[in-house]
């Protein structure tokens, strides 16, 4: 009897969600973000589709479904970080939230939830820090600089190309750093859980792999400084 009641409640809740989703007004609204000329980093929360482009002139524009009109928070703070947030609402998809951002350089990217960041162009700079959580993803980001620092959690995925003098990668859960076309001289790496990393290293790597994590690499680097535990592994790819 108890199991039947739970099942009925689950069906009712699903029906309410589906009915609510059908009635949502998905007419598209859009607006320009003020102070876009100061953007040097992006913080994304929720199911946003972000299109990040490299360009000499900075600009930022958002497009969202009408039912989210009073729930969207998009602004640039005094430190030059563009915040893209949305208050919790049932039935949000990435088709409901879109941002187009054009900036000369990028120093910081943080994304959570189910946000996707798609990149065009080549970004150059001294340092770049990336933090991805949940099911967030970065696709086709090209970066050339001195340092890159990447932290991945949950089921996040970072797809990058480019080059750096030094790279640091920390990945947990089932996250993935898909970077075979990113070349670094030195790598500091920490992989846990079932996380995976693929990168090109030319000189040396240090760090620790645990759980069922896996590091694949190209290049002739010295990896004797990488410790292995559990079922973790290192594979050289020709």
Model-derived segments and spans:
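Acidic (Asp/Glu) and glycine-rich low-complexity loops/linkers
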Residues: 19-112, 116-131, 142-151, 159-167, ...
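A residue-level signal for conserved active-site and pocket-lining positions in enzyme catalytic cores
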Residues: 46, 74, 109, 134, ...
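Short, surface-exposed interaction patches in beta-rich subdomains
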Residues: 158-238
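Bacterial Sec-dependent N-terminal signal peptides
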Residues: 1-30
């Amino acid at each position: 009897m108890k199991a039947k009641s739970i099942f009925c409640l689950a069906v009712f809740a699903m029906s309410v969600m589906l009915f609510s989703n059908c009635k949502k007004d998905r007419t598209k609204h859009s607006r320009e973000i003020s102070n876009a000329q100061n953007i040097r980093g992006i913080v994304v929360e929720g199911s946003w589709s972000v299109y990040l482009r490299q360009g000499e002139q900075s600009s930022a524009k958002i497009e969202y479904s009408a039912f989210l009109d009073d729930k969207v928070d998009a602004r640039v703070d005094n430190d030059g970080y563009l915040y893209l947030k949305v208050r919790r609402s049932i039935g949000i998809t990435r088709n409901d939230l879109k941002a187009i951002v054009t900036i000369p350089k990028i120093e910081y990217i943080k994304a959570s939830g189910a946000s996707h960041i798609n990149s065009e162009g080549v970004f150059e700079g001294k340092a770049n820090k990336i933090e991805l959580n949940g099911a967030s993803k970065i696709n086709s980001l090209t970066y050339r600089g001195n340092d890159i620092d990447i932290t991945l959690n949950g089921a996040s995925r970072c797809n990058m190309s480019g080059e750096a003098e030094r790279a640091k990668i920390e990945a947990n859960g089932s996250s993935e750093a898909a970077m075979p076309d990113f070349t670094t001289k030195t790598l500091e790496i920490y992989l846990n859980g079932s996380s995976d990393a693929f990168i090109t290293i030319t000189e040396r790597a240090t760090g620790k792999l645990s759980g069922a994590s896996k590091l694949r690499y190209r290049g002739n680097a010295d990896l004797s400084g990488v410790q292995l535990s559990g079922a973790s592994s290192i594979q050289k790819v020709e």
